[in-house]
C-alpha cells in the first residue's frame, strides 16, 4: 500500500464559481497547472499549497490530505 495526496481544489474552486483560469490567476500559476493538480497529476509545492489555503480561506488540511492507495 502506498500513500498519496488527495485534494479538494476542484470542489472548492467550483463552489466559488471560479474557472480554472481565475484560480490560476489568484494563486499565480498557469491554468494547465490547476488542471494537473485537480486531476492528481501534479502535487503542488508547500508554498503553492499554502497559497491555495489563503485564497480559499481554508485550513491546509481541508484542501489537501493523505490517503492510502492500494
Regions found by a protein language model. Name each.
Residues 1-4:
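A detector for short, charged/polar N-terminal pre-domain segments
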Residues 7-26:
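Short basic helix-loop element that most often maps to the first helix and adjoining turn
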Residues 9, 23-24, 34-37, 63:
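Conserved hydrophobic/aromatic packing and binding residues within compact polymer-binding modules
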Residues 47-62:
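DNA major-groove recognition helix of helix-turn-helix/homeodomain DNA-binding modules
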Residues 62-70:
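Short amphipathic recognition helices of helix-turn-helix/homeodomain-type DNA-binding modules
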Residues 28-42:
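Recognition helix of helix-turn-helix/homeodomain-like DNA-binding domains
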Residues 39, 58, 68:
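Short, conserved catalytic or interaction motifs in soluble domains
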Amino acid at each position: 500500500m502506498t500513500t498519496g495526496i488527495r485534494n479538494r481544489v476542484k470542489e472548492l474552486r467550483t463552489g466559488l464559481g471560479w474557472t480554472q483560469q481565475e484560480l490560476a490567476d489568484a494563486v499565480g500559476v498557469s491554468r494547465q497547472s490547476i488542471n494537473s493538480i485537480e486531476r492528481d497529476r501534479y502535487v503542488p509545492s508547500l508554498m503553492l499549497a499554502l497559497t491555495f489555503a489563503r485564497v480559499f480561506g481554508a485550513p491546509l488540511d481541508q484542501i489537501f490530505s493523505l490517503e492510502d492507495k492500494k
